[in-house]
From Swiss-Prot:
PANTHER family: 30S RIBOSOMAL PROTEIN S14, SMALL RIBOSOMAL SUBUNIT PROTEIN US14M. The gene is rpsN. Disulfide bonds: none annotated. PROSITE patterns: RIBOSOMAL_S14 (PS00527). GO terms for cellular component: cytoplasm; small ribosomal subunit. Keywords: Ribonucleoprotein, Ribosomal protein, RNA-binding, rRNA-binding. Part of the 30S ribosomal subunit. Contacts proteins S3 and S10. Belongs to the universal ribosomal protein uS14 family. Residues 49-70 are annotated as: Disordered. Residues 52-68 have a biased composition (Polar residues). This is Small ribosomal subunit protein uS14. GO terms for molecular function: rRNA binding; structural constituent of ribosome. Binds 16S rRNA, required for the assembly of 30S particles and may also be responsible for determining the conformation of the 16S rRNA at the A site.
């Protein structure tokens, strides 16, 4: 189990990323825009740098919904590999069965 503070930190990062998503996209469009002047680009870069670090989506970490484990995360299920195996063995994931060949 991950510490509660680590799970809470991820929740804050998700909220910040959602809050600043539109502003971030707008500034990045100005920076990468062909028609933008150098001065506008530089202003956009400075504004982008002044946004909170945790508002960047790349700072988010996928975590298991049940345990908060950051490694071995399977996106399809939203769980770590360990919890996927446990729930699959109990038959709680519809359509998933153990492979045998």
């Amino acid at each position: 189990m991950a510490k509660q503070s680590m799970k809470a930190r991820e929740v804050v990062r998700v909220k910040l990323a959602n809050k600043y998503r539109a502003k971030r996209e707008e500034l990045k469009a100005i920076i990468s825009g062909v028609n933008s002047s150098d001065e506008d680009r530089w202003d956009a870069v400075l504004k982008l740098q002044s946004l909170p670090r945790d508002s960047s989506p790349s700072r988010q970490r996928n975590r298991c919904n049940q345990t908060g484990r950051p490694h071995g995360f399977l996106r399809k299920f939203g769980l770590s590999r360990i919890k996927v195996r446990e729930t699959a063995m109990r038959g709680e994931i519809p359509g998933l069965k153990k492979a045998s060949w």
